[in-house]
């Protein structure tokens, strides 16, 4: 009898509480919007970085330095041979 009464109290409390609002249900479209925004931001940052590298003098100077060093090594090897 005591078990029956305690179960009845639990069931009544659940029924009287009513349906709970869906608070933690993630919205899939919102997740995709956030992911799309992140992708666009990343794309813009990468494009800006690549443009910065291609417009700077560093690649040209590096290429010239390697060419000059390679030419000097070739000349030294020719002289020694």
Curated annotation (Swiss-Prot):
One of its GO terms (molecular function) is fatty acid binding. Residues 1-24 form the signal peptide. Pfam families: ApoC-I. GO terms for cellular component: high-density lipoprotein particle; very-low-density lipoprotein particle. GO terms for biological process: lipid transport; lipoprotein metabolic process; negative regulation of cholesterol transport; negative regulation of lipid catabolic process; negative regulation of very-low-density lipoprotein particle clearance; triglyceride metabolic process; very-low-density lipoprotein particle clearance. The keyword Signal applies. The keyword Secreted applies. This is Apolipoprotein C-I, acidic form. The lineage of its organism: Eukaryota, Metazoa, Chordata, Craniata, Vertebrata.
